[in-house]
Amino acid sequence: MAAKPGIPKGTRDFSPVEMAKRNYIFNTIRDVYHLYGFQQIETPSMEMLSTLMGKYGEEGDKLLFKIQNSGDYFSGITDEELLSRNAAKLASKFCEKGLRYDLTVPFARYVVMHRDEITFPFKRYQIQPVWRADRPQKGRYREFYQCDADVVGSDSLLNEVELMQIVDTVFTRFGIRVCIKINNRKILTGIAEIIGEADKIVDITVAIDKLDKIGLDNVNKELAEKGISEEAIAKLQPIILLSGTNTEKLATLKTVLSDSETGLKGVEESEFILNTLQTMGLKNEIELDLTLARGLNYYTGAIFEVKALDVQIGSITGGGRYDNLTGVFGMAGVSGVGISFGADRIFDVLNQLELYPKEAVNGTQLLFINFGEKEAAFSMGILSKARAAGIRAEIFPDAAKMKKQMSYANVKNIPFVAIVGENEMNEGKAMLKNMESGEQQLVTAEELIGALTK
């Protein structure tokens, strides 16, 4: 007996109903991006490892899916290297390419490669899958879609403001209540400076970014393991646990970071973004959260994260400013800021809260019953007119028993069935049945179209 087929952990198949829901998500996000003047691009699923490595920090590099070279890749490996069993070293010999970890780094590579064709500031969006060799769990997958929007070639903070408006608009359209969290890497840098651990900024941000997941005690333990002094850890506590309104937090930070020019610059930027957004009348809550660190190496200014308020799940959107990203590809001085919607987590949230609009997940609206060759030929004429009017319609392909065809309509939740037998053909009409109410009505093609498009 053949082994039952399976799929890799952390990946999923999607049924037609699930794809209808996913397309509702993608189309909603795409429509909002278009409202703000963003244009779509795509990049390859695989990138050179030299493009990807070193852009996500040590932890991110470990999560890259590497693609084994084709051909005789053992020919360049010595016996000594094989016997060493050094996985990282051997991988560098076997693999030159990797699956993309996110859409931001490939976008930076795209900008550098196509700089002569791009008009700046360049507002692009991209909706494609990414892959991470992570441990699968609820809300975390190894293959998932991101829906990114980025602006490069402008350092104006109005870009940050517009991206937050996009986030607010998208989740308002979905009907998901969210909290938009904002912070600034310059504030975090300033905090590292005033506690006397400026050179440990990456270790500090990686640790405090885990506060929600592992708790304060474990964050402090990790900080200590990274060589951060007890005194510095003690100074850090009241800062990362700072409470109050956004205005109160900013006022406190101005005092706390008074000796850090970088830190004060971060406060100034955050104040501008928050104050401007306040005049926009956002529908969702926005919060300055000093524990938001997003443990990635490339953010240099504002950073964002979005949490759903009515569902226990991780971040469903994130982003930030990454002024230095294109520099590693030989193109300095290009400032960029972007956001990324986690479509797969949004899918789960909409499912849990039952927020999908009925019209978004409905497939076929009308099924023509097939009684035989003559009846099918007559039905095809009405069917063509219905489709031309924008009605999603189909005909059962075989002249099967009526019970089987009606069962097909029920299973697929098709709301209307058109029955065309000899009597209907003689009158040039069809019997239209409402599958929910059971009501039947003899109608012309025009009346049928009117009933389904009103």
Curated annotation (Swiss-Prot):
Determine the domain of life of the protein's source.
Answer: Bacteria
Q: Which reaction does it catalyse?
A: tRNA(His) + L-histidine + ATP = L-histidyl-tRNA(His) + AMP + diphosphate + H(+)
| Membrane-traversing stretches | none
Q: Which GO biological process entries does UniProt record here?
A: histidyl-tRNA aminoacylation
For this record, the Gene Ontology CC terms, alphabetical, are: cytoplasm
EC number, as in UniProt:
6.1.1.21
Indicate where this protein resides in the cell. Cytoplasm
**Which keywords label this protein?**
Aminoacyl-tRNA synthetase, ATP-binding, Cytoplasm, Ligase, Nucleotide-binding, Protein biosynthesis
Query: CDD domains, from UniProt?
Result: HisRS-like_core, HisRS_anticodon
Show the GO MF annotations.
ATP binding; histidine-tRNA ligase activity
Instruction: Check the record and name the Pfam families matching this protein.
Output: HGTP_anticodon, tRNA-synt_His
PANTHER family referenced in this protein's UniProt entry, alphabetically:
HISTIDINE--TRNA LIGASE, HISTIDYL-TRNA SYNTHETASE
Q: Which family does it belong to?
A: Belongs to the class-II aminoacyl-tRNA synthetase family.
Subunit description: Homodimer.
Q: Sorted alphabetically, which HAMAP family does this protein's record hold? A: His_tRNA_synth
Supply the name of the protein: Histidine--tRNA ligase
